[in-house]
């Protein structure tokens, strides 16, 4: 339930990046900026679903500390920084930097998503909290 929803949200975020990358590659800066705004929102909403809803539910059972949830939060921080740098490169109309940040974003995000999908979401499915209520809470973040 949660694993499927969050995995699909990963795919949806990925799908928003592809046309953005194409616009950057073609130096269509107005279009790139138009695409960047909803892309960034989708990514930040995804992180908020995890950090504000899912992770606290999980931490009730597994604790915080420096385990997998802590690592995911740290990676979110790094990815946020890359997304911000990507936006700055788009505003500066710097194709090389924008494509570089985009490539870094894709590599980091693919590795990050794999860890979440294979480890964290699987763990979440096994913990004894109300999955339906949690899913509804996460969906409110997206709206």
Predicted regions: what they are:
Residues 1-143:
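Small-residue-biased structural context
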């Amino acid at each position: 339930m949660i694993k499927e929803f969050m995995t699909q949200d990963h795919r949806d975020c990925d799908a928003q990046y592809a046309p953005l990358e194409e616009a950057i590659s073609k130096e269509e800066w107005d279009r790139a900026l138009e695409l960047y705004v909803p892309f960034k929102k989708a990514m930040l909403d995804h992180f908020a679903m995890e950090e504000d809803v899912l992770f606290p539910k999980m931490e009730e059972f597994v604790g915080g500390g420096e385990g997998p949830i802590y690592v995911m939060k740290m990676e979110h921080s790094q990815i946020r920084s890359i997304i911000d740098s990507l936006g700055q490169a788009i505003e500066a109309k710097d194709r090389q930097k924008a494509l570089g940040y985009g490539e870094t974003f894709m590599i980091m995000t693919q590795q990050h998503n794999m860890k979440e999908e294979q480890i964290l979401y699987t763990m979440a499915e096994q913990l004894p909290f109300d999955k339906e209520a949690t899913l509804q809470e996460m969906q409110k973040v997206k709206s």
